[in-house]
């Protein structure tokens, strides 16, 4: 395909392939052992049990040890569960605490909306005030502090509504080339909006190719790729609407390619009388190299923000206080 030829040409121009050992063919055992020992030394000197990019949530990091290099992480949920808010909280923590660039492909929302969400979360400013410009006198110091925190941070947002895997790799290479060949994290919102241009394949086959391309992206840049994903609406017919692996839309390839799959679930979306108002569950349904389990977080909707240490129950006043 012409796109593949262009993709390979750009790789050669940027000399990316020379830096990626996985592109160089079979490697003998001795250098692999040396690399493994170097990695063990690196991990031994790391802070606590965190060996990847931290999420900002202690209980979640205890299960994952952070988002690992070369991993494809899926964050899935039904509409209104807070997938984008959660992803942007991960972006916020990464750009404020790590030096490597973070690249966000926002196929659903314009970049302005994402910046509003970041400012709302960091400054604890009601997002409605930001969207309408109706900030109070007390809000402005928080706004200025949030804007200052983000200024000059290595965050890049691509909000073009349609992108192919080839285009995504090309744009990632350009950012990496400007930062010593490195990326700290890539976020895709969301997977099902990606397209392979010119394909005549059915949608399941196309999603399979997209899923595989995201895993290849993680491998090429040796960074975590966090991709948001839709879930089948059929789960809403069940009494217990907590997602399971089979609920992933066009799930076969996604389930196979992902190293870690998380589901976002908030019971209050379905049950007005739930005792778990303001509580979100981050359900790890697949973890190729670690445990699965559920982490409870608090959800502050007005700030588009998830926070750690949700107690067993919240009263309704918490989310409005």
Language-model segments: residues:
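Amphipathic alpha-helical transducer elements in NTP-driven molecular machines
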Residues: 3, 54-57, 111-115, 137-147, ...
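Cytosolic-facing regulatory segments adjacent to core modules
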Residues: 62, 93-182, 196, 295, ...
């Amino acid at each position: 395909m012409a796109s593949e030829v262009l993709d390979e040409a750009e790789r050669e121009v940027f000399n990316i392939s020379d830096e990626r050992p996985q592109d160089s063919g079979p490697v003998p055992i001795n250098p692999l052992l040396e690399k493994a020992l170097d990695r063990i030394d690196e991990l031994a000197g790391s802070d606590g049990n965190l060996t990847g990019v931290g999420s900002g949530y202690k209980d979640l990091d205890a299960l994952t040890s952070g988002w690992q290099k070369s991993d494809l992480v899926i964050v899935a949920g039904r509409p209104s569960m807070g997938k984008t808010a959660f992803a942007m909280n991960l972006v916020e923590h990464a750009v404020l605490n790590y030096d490597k660039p973070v690249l966000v492909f926002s196929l659903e929302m314009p970049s302005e909306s994402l910046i509003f969400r970041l400012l709302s979360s960091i400054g604890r400013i009601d997002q409605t005030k930001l969207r309408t410009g109706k900030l109070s006198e007390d809000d402005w110091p928080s706004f200025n502090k949030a804007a200052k925190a983000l200024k000059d941070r290595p965050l890049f947002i691509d909000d073009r509504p349609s992108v192919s895997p080839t285009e995504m790799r090309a744009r990632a290479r350009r950012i990496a080339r400007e930062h010593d060949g490195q990326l700290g994290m890539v976020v895709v919102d969301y997977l099902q909006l990606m397209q392979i241009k010119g394909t005549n394949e059915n949608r399941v086959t196309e999603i399979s190719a997209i899923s595989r391309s995201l895993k290849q992206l993680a491998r090429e840049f040796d960074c975590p790729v966090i991709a948001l994903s839709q879930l089948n609406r059929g789960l809403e017919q069940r009494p217990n609407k907590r997602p399971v692996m089979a609920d992933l839309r066009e799930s076969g390839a996604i389930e196979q390619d992902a190293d870690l799959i998380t589901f976002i679930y908030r019971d209050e979306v379905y049950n007005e009388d739930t005792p778990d108002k303001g509580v979100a569950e981050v359900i790890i349904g697949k973890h190729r190299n670690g445990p699965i389990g559920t982490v409870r977080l608090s959800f502050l909707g007005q700030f588009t923000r998830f926070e750690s240490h949700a107690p067993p129950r919240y009263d309704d006043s918490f989310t409005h206080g």
